[in-house]
Amino acid sequence: MALSWNEIKNRAINFSKEWEKEQREHAESQSFWNDFFNIFGISRKRVASFEEPVKKLGEQRGRIDLFWKGTLLVEHKSRGKDLAKAYTQAMDYFPGLKEAELPKYILISDFETFKLYDLEEDKNYEFTLNELYKNVHLFGFIAGYTKHKVVAEDPINIQAAQMMGKLHDKLKDVGYDGHPLELFLVRLLFLGFAEDTSIFEKRAFLEFLENKTSEDGSDLGSKLTELFQVLNTPFEKRLKNLDESLATFPYVNGKLFEEFLPIPSFDSKMREILLECCYLDWSKISPAIFGSLFQSIMDKEHRRNLGAHYTSEANILKLIRPLFLDELYEKFEKVKKNKKQLAEFHKELSTLHFLDPACGSGNFLIIAYRELRILELEILKILYSENVLDISSIVWCDVDQFHGIEVEEFPAQIAQVAMWLIDHQMNMMISEHFGQYFVRLPLKKSANIVHANSLQISWEDVISKEKLTYILGNPPFIGKKEQNKEQKDDMVRIFNKVQGAGVLDYVTAWYLKASKYIQNTKIKVAFVSTNSIVQGEQVGILWKELFSNYGIKIHFAHQT
C-alpha cells in the first residue's frame, strides 16, 4: 500500500538530516539509495540493482550505479562533481539496453544536489538535499502515485494488443482454447495492470514469474494456477506456511479468480512472451482500448460475422457529451459556488445509471464512467480540503452504476475487468490530489455485464426502467444480405408486423427495442450507427415507425 504524501514528506525531511554531511561517492552511496527508496515505502532490492553491467558503444563495458529496468537510471557522484557529465555518462548506456529496459527517468546526485530528468515529458528538475521534501511529488512513480497520461493512441496500447495476441495464438496452438483460454487471458490482463498501478507491490508479479518459474516454462501453468487461487483467498484463510512470494499478493475477490481453470502447458517461448508483456508499463494502457485488443485476438471471419468494430474515443465523446456530459457540466457551473447545492448535485451523480445493450468489451461504459469520475473529482476539490481523513467515504460514484449486455462471453468478461481497471485509475487520480492511497480491494462492486443476446432478453431483467437514466452504445451494423439465420429471426421478432422491415440493417433492432423500453420514462438514448439508416429505402420504414408509434424525438446527430 502506498504511503500518504504527508508520511513521505516527513521521511524525506529525516533522510535529508541524516545525509547532509556525507560526501564520498562509493563509501556510502548504496546505503544512501536504499534509504532514498525507503522514503517512499519501497524496498530498493525489490525493484532495482546496483552496478548493473551494460555494454556501451565501441564494445566498451560499463556499470550503471543503480538501475530499475524500464523506469529509472541513477548515476551517483561525489559531492561537487560535474553532474552534467554524469548525465552524459547515463545517456551513453542507452544503446546497450533493450527496448523494454529503457528508463523513463534519469536521476543524478552527489549527495547534496539532485537532478531529475523526465524523459517522456522532456522536463528536468534540480533541487538540493534540503529541498527534497518539497519535491517528493516528482517521484510519485516510485511511491505508486503514477501520473502517466493515459492516451488511447499511445503505441503501448498496440504493443500490448500484439503481445497478448501472440500469447493467445501460442496457447490455442497447443489446444488450450474456448472459455478457459478467454478467462485465462482476462486474468493476465488484470495482473499486468495491477503490477504497474499499485494494486500489487511493485514488480510482485514479474518477480514471481522470473524467480519462481522454470526458464523452460514447464511449471508456469501450475504456478499461475496457484497464484490465481491465492488471489481468490482472503488473508485469514490462507495457509500459514504460504511461500512469501505468494503471501504478499492481495485478496482480489470480484469472482475474477474464482473459477478453477484447466492448467495450460507453457514452453520457454511462451514464458518469454508473458515476461515481455510484464515489461510493458501497463499504467499507461487505456482500458478503453480493450475493445481493439479483443479485435486483434479474434480471427477476421469471426469479426466480420459479429459486425464488431472499434469506436474511437473521439467519436464516443461526440456521443456522450450531448447525451449527458454537457448538461452535467452546465449544472456544475451553476451550483459550484453553493456548497449545499453542490453536495446535492454530487449525490445526484451517484444515482445515475447507464446501459449499453451491445457493450462489446465496454468502450462506451469505460469512457462514460471515466468522465463521470473526473466531474466527481472537480466537485470533491470544492467540497473537501486536501486534509480529508478518509477519501473512501467521499467518493460516491462506482462501477455498479453501469450495465451492459453482450452476446459474446469473452468481450463481456473484458468489459467487467476493464471497468475495475478504469475505476482504479480514477482512484489513483483522486489519491494524487488528496495525498492518500485509495484502492477498492477486495472488490465488492462490479459493473453489471450480462452475457446474452440483447435482442432476445428483456432489458428490464438487466436494469429496471425506473432506475435507468441513459442508454448508449454502438450496436453491430449488419446489412440485410450479411445477416445469418439467428439475426434474421431477431429482426422478425423485434419488428413483428412492421411492413418492409426485411430491408433494414441489424442495428435498427436496437433503435426499436430502445424506443419500446423508454416509453413513459425520461431515459435518453444515443447510438453510433451506419449512415444507411438515415438515407435510402430504410428511412421511411424505420423512422416512420419510431416517430408515429413511439413518439421519438431527435435531440442531436453527428456525421462521422
Language-model-derived ranges and their functions:
Residues M1-Y105, L119-D122, K147:
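A short, conserved, highly charged catalytic patch centered on acidic carboxylates
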Residues A2-S16, N130-E371, Q401, I405-I414, ...:
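Preference for the N-terminal adenyl/adenosyl cofactor-binding alpha/beta module
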Residues N10-N14, W68-K69, D299, I394-D398, ...:
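Surface-exposed beta-strand-to-loop junctions
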Residues E22, K56-G62, R79, L83, ...:
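Signature of N6-adenine DNA methyltransferases within the class I
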Residues F36-I39, G96, L191-D196, P322, ...:
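Active-site catalytic microenvironments for nucleophilic, acid-base chemistry
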Residues V47-F50, A204-F208, K331-S350, L372-Q401, ...:
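Flexible phosphate/Mg2+-sensing switch loops adjacent to catalytic phosphate-binding sites
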Residues K69, E101, K347, L352, ...:
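Structured loop/turn residues at beta-strand edges in well-structured enzyme cores
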Residues K170-K172, D398-I405, Q519, K524-V528:
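Conserved alpha/beta enzyme-core scaffolds, especially Rossmann-like or related mixed alpha/beta domains
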